[in-house]
A protein has these predicted regions:
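Extended amphipathic alpha-helical scaffolds
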Residues: 1-41, 234-248, 256, 263-264
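Single-stranded RNA-binding regions, centering on S1/OB-family and related RNA-binding modules
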Residues: 234, 238, 243-357
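Conserved glycine-bearing catalytic or ligand-binding loops at nucleotide- and phosphate-handling centers
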Residues: 33-55, 61-64, 113, 191-221, ...
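Short beta-alpha junctions and helix-cap segments that line functional grooves
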Residues: 12, 35-38, 135-136, 157-163, ...
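Mobile "lid/hinge" segments at catalytic clefts and subdomain interfaces of large enzymes
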Residues: 122-227
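Conserved helix-loop functional segments at active or binding sites
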Residues: 30, 55-60, 80-93, 99, ...
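Glycine-rich, flexible beta-strand/loop modules in the N-terminal catalytic cores of phosphate-handling
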Residues: 10-95, 182-192, 196-201
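Flexible hinge/switch segments at interdomain interfaces of large molecular machines
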Residues: 51-59, 90-94, 177-182, 193, ...
Length: 357
């Protein structure tokens, strides 16, 4: 096991077991990067995606590398299911998460190696997963493949961590993945009529021991997720504003929010209908700047607060002082001086600084 293999990736790891080796990478993005799926039942969103790549050179062959095939899509979905159960909620970790598995060498069980590799890459990226996920492929050899192994004269052997030949000539490929608390994904392919409860129980017991050894090997390299995301990953801050202030933040035709984005070096600002605002940017200073601008827009002056602002307009009856953002307050002419004042312009002018309550 090895982590931080690729320095510029948000998270990376390499997992090797025998003659199978997989490099896993994790990329973090804003929630607006979710994959939108438009199907017959309506639109759905995917916040976590796992892609599995099995190039021909991983098994010593030469071939074209085009669109993913059925096998690659299936293995990707299996890994996605195995890892999805330990991911933090969107509220806990408001990022879109994309994992890639690159099989660079394969002699069986590459789908389970991809689960182990990307479990480490998630922790390397600072994703606060709930536990270490490990996977193993179990096999079965019977002396009469035409019959179920429940016959007394049909002896069988259960194999742990099957190789390519054992997968090809064997009677079962049983993929098991999960944490120390339980299983998160199972997939069984069999070439015989079925398996008994005894065989299934024995296979799961052996798989549990093997997965525990793999978890220990992973924990020796990276025992828990990093406390912070990579410096190359987008930083973010989430906060709440009153729903009635959303229109002020967005502005007419999006003018206000677009101006903030330009002024903050392209910071991404997500505004939800419930008033939740999330700001993403690689530079923390730009995030702080965008948040301060939104705070100024949504802030309301309270009785008793003291402000020091610039005079923006002077009328006979008083002076208008900028309190914060685009909010001005009127300082009545009677408050400018203890004595009687006929005209505010005789006391202050535009550009002066006043401390007001």
């Amino acid at each position: 096991c090895q982590v931080d293999l690729l320095p510029r990736a948000h998270g990376s790891a390499m997992f090797t077991r025998g003659q199978t080796q997989v490099i896993g990478t994790t990329t973090l993005g804003p929630l607006s990067d979710k994959q939108i799926i438009d199907n017959l039942t309506g639109e759905t969103e995917r916040r976590f995606m796992h892609h599995y790549n099995f190039p021909p050179y991983s098994v010593g062959e030469i071939g074209r590398m085009g669109a993913p095939g059925r096998r690659e899509i299936g293995h990707g979905k299996l890994g996605e299911r195995a890892l999805s159960y330990v991911l933090p909620s969107e509220a806990e970790f408001p990022y879109t998460i994309l994992c890639f598995s690159y099989v660079v060498e394969s002699n069986g069980s590459s789908s389970q190696a991809s689960i182990c590799a990307n479990c480490m890459s998630l922790m390397s990226a600072g994703v606060p997963i709930k536990g270490i996920v490990s996977g193993i492929a179990m096999g079965l050899i019977t002396n009469d493949p035409s019959r179920s192994p429940d016959k007394k004269d049909n002896h069988y052997t259960i194999l742990t961590d099957i190789q390519g030949l054992e997968d090809h000539f064997g009677d079962m490929d049983f993929k098991c993945a999960g944490t120390e608390k339980g299983l998160t994904a199972l997939q069984m392919d069999i070439k015989i009529h079925g398996v008994t409860r005894e065989v299934l129980h024995e296979a799961l017991e052996q798989a549990n021991k093997a997965r525990a050894e793999i978890r220990a090997a992973i924990a020796a390299v990276i025992p828990e997720p990093r406390k912070e995301v990579s410096k190359y990953a987008p930083k973010m801050v989430t906060f709440q504003i009153p729903t009635e202030k959303i229109r002020d933040v967005i502005g007419k035709g999006g003018e206000t929010i677009q101006g903030m984005i330009r002024e903050c070096d392209g910071a991404e600002i997500d505004v939800e209908a419930d008033g939740t605002i999330t700001i993403y940017h690689h530079n923390q200073e730009m995030i702080d700047k965008a948040k301060a601008m939104i705070d100024d827009i949504t802030r309301e002056a309270k009785v008793g607060e003291i402000f020091e602002g610039e005079v923006t307009r002077v009328e006979d009856y008083g002076a208008f002082v900028n309190l914060f953002g685009d909010t001005d307050g009127l300082c009545h002419v009677s408050r400018l001086k203890w004595d009687y004042v006929d005209n505010a312009s005789s006391i202050v002018k535009v550009g002066d600084t006043l401390k007001v309550v």
